Amino acid sequence: MDLRTMTQSLVTLAEDNMAFFSGQGPGETARRLSGVFAGIREQALGLEPALGRLLSVAHLFDLDAETPANGYRSLVHTARCCLAHLLHKSRYVASNRRSIFFRTSHNLAELEAYLAALTQLRALAYYAQRLLAINRPGKLFFEGDEGITADFLREYVTLHKGCFYGRCLGFQFTPAIRPFLQTISIGLVSFGEHYKRNETGLSVTASSLFTSGRFAIDPELRGAEFERIIQNLDVHFWKAFWNITEIEVLSSLANMASATVRVSRLLSLPPKAFEMPLTADPKLTVTISPPLAHTGPGPVLVRLISYDLREGQDSEELSSLVRSEGPRGLELRPRPQQAPRSRSLVVHIHGGGFVAQTSKSHEPYLKSWAQELGVPILSIDYSLAPEAPFPRALEECFYAYCWAVKHCGLLGSTGERICLAGDSAGGNLCFTVSLRAAAYGVRVPDGIMAAYPATMLQSAASPSRLLSLMDPLLPLSVLSKCVSAYAGGEMEDHSDSDQKALGMMGLVRRDTALLFRDLRLGASSWLNSFLELSGHKSRPNLVPTEEPMRRSVSEAALAQPEGPLGTDSLKYLTLHDLSLSSETQDTPELSLSAETLGPTTPSAVNFLFRPEDAPEEAEARDDISTKEEKVYSVRAAFPEGFHPRRSSQGAIQMPLYSAPIVKNPFMSPLLAPDSMLQTLPPVHIVACALDPMLDDSVMFARRLRSLGQPVTLHVVEDLPHGFLSLAALCRETRQAAALCVDRIRFILNPPGPATPAGPTTPPV
């Protein structure tokens, strides 16, 4: 169904339902249902022309006709998903509204939530239109200095997001993955309650499990709490949450479902300099020094994974590098025969926003790769930010890559073909490691497979970045905090000093007491929530006669006396309300002042701001508050009468970031000069159509193709960022993971005669 037909069908159904409920008397329920359908009609009619304009020019930003993908297309697709859900729900209401089994309360809550989502999507469509108007032809990232990114920041950070994390969570993704996203969101908000209590990882996880009942029952509460967490908690919270998968119990469970391999060893590479032959003249060598940045020389951890035991992998030299990971069970299987060295090697760099995870959490899909490809895989455990900011991770990955090239024989490979593979932040490091190898003059890999890579860490507005408003895995503020930590803007958290002082037995005693306390409170909370919900469902009147202690987000908005949709609700401060702050003293003023956005430290790189827009932070704030309001007034963002919903959490702490380090080509490879990009080997990118970082992949591929570099771009539909870690979840993620394996296989076994990219080192 095309966009116009879908919109017309939805409008017709909305008008029919609106007329029906308007004639049901003066009851509150009928009034709210009539009002919500009136809102659906209004937003759908306003959204359709904006989406049509975006779709009419979206093809100009594709890599080619065979790869129709960019942020504009993704926004249109997301809005279509929301319209399709509302169309389905409106048809259901029209068919069942007279039935005695019609669940009025449930359907009303769902319609309200999706109306809020549709309103916010309309705002994003207008933002995308403005980007389209001011961007250079064919450019997805804003590169001008007109101050439009300041205007984006001022408006975007205050948009209401909770509706996307409650009932509408993951509506844009494939249905098979939505239960997983709901589990993640419930775990996140529950984990947030126990964060900073000085509990150990297992205790926090267990406590969160038993106190999450009310978040599972109440989607509106979950959405509001999710919004609070993403806007207020620092990078250390996200580091702790993402590292839950590193807990021994959980990692063991994950490994039980993964492929069984003969070799999975954690190695510690000593910080010793060594020589590498130059590609131009193998008789000459260059010294590869150990990592030095920030913390001085130190070992680099890597994990060797091989489906078969190959020659060299059980050598004494390699065994001397093995690092113990705890007690191992008795090996009862007979010692296998050694397979010959593989002609290929995969060097893998994991993702995690530069701040979290290790090869251990990525081991399940790496084992599958080792089995399917039949080659050894070396995964690098680089040091993480904020404790080890840029360029420490790059130095460690480059050192480990060079060590692997030189000592490939120990890893069970002859090194004829070498592939660099990584996802997200790991994809970024794959590109920069290859650029550094070319700069040193040593062998570059034969190809790079990057899954949903981050190639643009400099702050700049783009249409796909707008998707971060609704993405449960990559919200805008989380992206900002991760990049800030990697750039050195986040200081190390020393809040664990008390844990060290307690000692192991003290931690165990304290965590046991806290766990039993949380079990008791969690059971009570869950029972109260269940009884409250049951009591609510048993009432004949859906709206209680007394004001409850806490209303849902949608109820609070619709219960206001002004207008059918409660447009004056303080839960959703509109742009109009904020612009009248001089007349209403209790409404906060929306500006980029230090009072609004926090201290002017480089602690929050935002993805909607370029450093050029703020060469001097004090001048930039003054300039934005005066000149930018004249040129890009807040009211000019939207048509007359349209006001998106605003967050009750206040502005995200995202001050302007002016450090030039984010423009470093070894940090943002998209900004590298042509001469550097021309040194890259063939690049194969697998991106997600609904990923806030989609434009990174599209623009990087366009840039390489314009230079005549071999590059392919494959875009998978309806999956979130990070699908490799979800490979076993459903058919769609398995197919996407198989595409990554296919790209690696193409690099290792190219059609026609294969020639190494550089001189190979004799196996050690």
UniProtKB/Swiss-Prot annotation:
Outcome of substituting G722R: In strain: Norwegian Landrace
Keyword annotations: Cell membrane, Cholesterol metabolism, Cytoplasm, Hydrolase, Lipid degradation, Lipid droplet, Lipid metabolism, Membrane, Phosphoprotein, Steroid metabolism, Sterol metabolism
Main location: membrane
This protein's name: Hormone-sensitive lipase
Organism per entry: Sus scrofa (Pig)
Mutagenesis or variant effect for H160R: In strain: Large white
Pathway: Glycerolipid metabolism; triacylglycerol degradation
Enzyme's top EC category: hydrolase
SUPFAM superfamilies xrefs: alpha/beta-Hydrolases (SSF53474)
Modification Phosphoserine, positions: S552, S554, S593, S625, S647, S648
Disordered: annotated span: 316-339
GO terms of molecular function: all-trans-retinyl-palmitate hydrolase, all-trans-retinol forming activity; diacylglycerol lipase activity; monoacylglycerol lipase activity; retinyl-palmitate esterase activity; rRNA primary transcript binding; sterol ester esterase activity; triacylglycerol lipase activity
Similarity field: Belongs to the 'GDXG' lipolytic enzyme family.
InterPro entries referenced in this protein's UniProt entry, alphabetically: AB_hydrolase_3, AB_hydrolase_fold, HSL_N, Lipase_GDXG_HIS_AS, Lipase_GDXG_put_SER_AS
Chain's role: Lipase with broad substrate specificity, catalyzing the hydrolysis of triacylglycerols (TAGs), diacylglycerols (DAGs), monoacylglycerols (MAGs), cholesteryl esters and retinyl esters. Shows a preferential hydrolysis of DAGs over TAGs and MAGs. Preferentially hydrolyzes fatty acid (FA) esters at the sn-3 position of the glycerol backbone in DAGs and FA esters at the sn-1 and sn-2 positions of the glycerol backbone in TAGs.
Entry superkingdom: Eukaryota
The keyword Cell wall biogenesis/degradation belongs to this UniProt entry's keyword annotation: no
Disulfide partners: none
Assembly with partners or alone: Monomer and homodimer. Interacts with CAVIN1 in the adipocyte cytoplasm. Interacts with PLIN5.
Pfam family, one: Abhydrolase_3
UniProt EC number: 3.1.1.79, 3.1.1.23
A Gene Ontology BP annotation from the UniProt entry: cholesterol metabolic process
Ranges of biased composition (kind: Basic and acidic residues): 325-334
Chain positions of motif Involved in the stabilization of the negatively charged intermediate by the formation of the oxyanion hole: 350-352
